[in-house]
Amino acid sequence: MLKVIDHPLIKQKLSVIRSQKAGHDVFRKNVIEIASLMTYEVFRNYKLKEIKIDTPVAQDVLAYDYDKEIVIVAILRAGLAMVPGIVNLLPKARVGHIGIFRDEKTFEPNNYFYKIPDVPKDSEILIVDPMLATGNSAVYAIERLKKDGFKNIRLLSLVGVQEGVDNIEKNVGKDFPIFLGSLDEKLNDKKYIVPGLGDAGDRIFGTK
């Protein structure tokens, strides 16, 4: 279930990081800001529980708090850059990590690290990765989390292509929630998104 978050601030900031002139400092800053902006829409339907609090002038006032644990799962390494923008709005959220690298010949995912907080299986899980290209890494992450018993899982990426969306819908289900800032045109022969962002990990961390 694809949702492209159409917002002028997201469009403008995506334009900044699409430019090859953007250095790693500018790129990283805008990735954080875009992730923060997109968080509003991702958690639009998140259910809160009612609590009672005392204000400076009243007692037993109706208020709201988290109903379920929230876990942000960053796909390493590029997904790390999105975490600060999200936890800035969700400070109680826990953070997990899945290390995946793509084989440059087969384009298949290889897992080298997996660490998820010990939380109830009905927790809200948000996988974050700036790019949804082939979708193979996302499918691996989703299936690994489902194997561990998690059910409430969604994916947040800055940009993606239909091929990646189709891969998830085919292997996970058409109702799986996917949130993108932009649905780009296609993948090139090296499986890079076009027009895309280039190698998001290298651009975030200033490496090549």
From Swiss-Prot:
UniProt EC number: 2.4.2.9
**What chemistry does it catalyse, as a reaction equation?**
UMP + diphosphate = 5-phospho-alpha-D-ribose 1-diphosphate + uracil
Q: Which HAMAP family match?
A: Upp_B (MF_01218_B)
According to its UniProt entry, the function of this protein is described as: Catalyzes the conversion of uracil and 5-phospho-alpha-D-ribose 1-diphosphate (PRPP) to UMP and diphosphate.
- Part of which pathway? Pyrimidine metabolism; UMP biosynthesis via salvage pathway; UMP from uracil: step 1/1
**Record InterPro entries:** PRibTrfase_dom, PRTase-like, Upp_B, UPRTase/APRTase, Ura_phspho_trans
Name of the featured protein: Uracil phosphoribosyltransferase
Instruction: Name the Pfam families for this protein.
Output: UPRTase (PF14681)
What cofactor does its activity depend on? Mg(2+)
Q: Does the keyword Kinase apply?
A: no
Coiled-coil stretches noted in the UniProt entry, renumbered to this chain: none
What is the activity regulation entry? Allosterically activated by GTP.
| Name of the gene | upp
Quick one: a GO biological-process term for this protein? UMP salvage
The top EC class, named as a word, is transferase
What does the UniProt cofactor note say? Binds 1 Mg(2+) ion per subunit. The magnesium is bound as Mg-PRPP.
Residues engaged in binding 5-phospho-alpha-D-ribose 1-diphosphate: 77, 102, 129-137, 199
Query: Binding of uracil: at which residues?
Result: 193, 198-200
Q: Which NCBIfam families does the record associate with it?
A: PRK00129.1, upp
Family, per the entry? Answer: Belongs to the UPRTase family.
Question: What UniProt keywords are attached to this protein's entry?
Answer: Allosteric enzyme, Glycosyltransferase, GTP-binding, Magnesium, Nucleotide-binding, Transferase
